[in-house]
């Protein structure tokens, strides 16, 4: 139930048409930061006050409110998150954490392999990739992404933070049967085991 003092937004604010972002904060924060001649323009940008982008953003906000995107994202979360938690219980050696809120969720994949399994696989990886400190972690997550796409036609991606979570970004129009299909497909994919998934991915 945290209430932020500062909120930034972008991407969907442009309604898929305009490039626009916004910075919103509480009045007391705004006054403390900008309510003087020296700092009054600190929050401005080179490209601002463009009428078409502003109108697009206003209409995007209207649609978000009128179509109740918040309710829809919560409905997605209430199906997807428990399903991911169940998969974590089923595959505790593969999924180390479940994260997210609304329609954006993710699972952290355990990449803590022993040398017994790691060393034979590392020999299959092209040398230019092994210079990246996160190379093996990326390959592990990418092997799951690849299988989900090739076999089940599901597009996922990994995040950019240190844990490189497998991100599931469900469209707001997603129906329950699609979420169920995703969870079933992820279950089938993880049941193959990471060693088989990684070997298949590297060979491909």
What does each model-identified segment do?
Residues 1-204:
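Conserved N-terminal phosphate-binding loop of PLP-dependent enzymes in the Aspartate aminotransferase
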């Amino acid at each position: 139930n945290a209430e932020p003092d500062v909120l930034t937004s972008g991407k969907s604010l442009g309604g898929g048409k305009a490039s626009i972002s916004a910075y919103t904060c509480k009045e007391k924060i705004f006054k403390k930061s900008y309510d003087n001649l020296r700092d009054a323009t600190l929050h401005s940008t080179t490209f601002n006050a463009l009428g078409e982008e502003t109108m697009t953003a206003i209409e995007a906000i209207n649609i978000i409110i009128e179509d109740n995107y918040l309710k829809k994202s919560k409905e997605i979360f209430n199906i997807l998150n428990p399903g991911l938690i169940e998969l974590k219980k089923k595959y505790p050696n593969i999924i180390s954490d479940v994260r997210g809120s609304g329609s954006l969720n993710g699972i952290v994949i355990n990449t803590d392999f022993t040398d017994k399994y790691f060393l034979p696989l590392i020999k299959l990886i092209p040398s230019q990739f092994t210079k990246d400190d996160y190379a093996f972690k990326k390959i592990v997550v990418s092997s799951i992404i690849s299988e989900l796409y090739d076999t089940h036609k599901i597009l996922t991606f990994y995040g950019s933070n240190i844990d490189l979570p497998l991100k599931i970004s469900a469209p707001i129009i997603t129906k329950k049967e699609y979420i169920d299909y995703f969870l079933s497909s992820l279950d089938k994919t993880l049941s193959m085991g990471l060693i088989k998934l990684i070997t298949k991915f590297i060979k491909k």
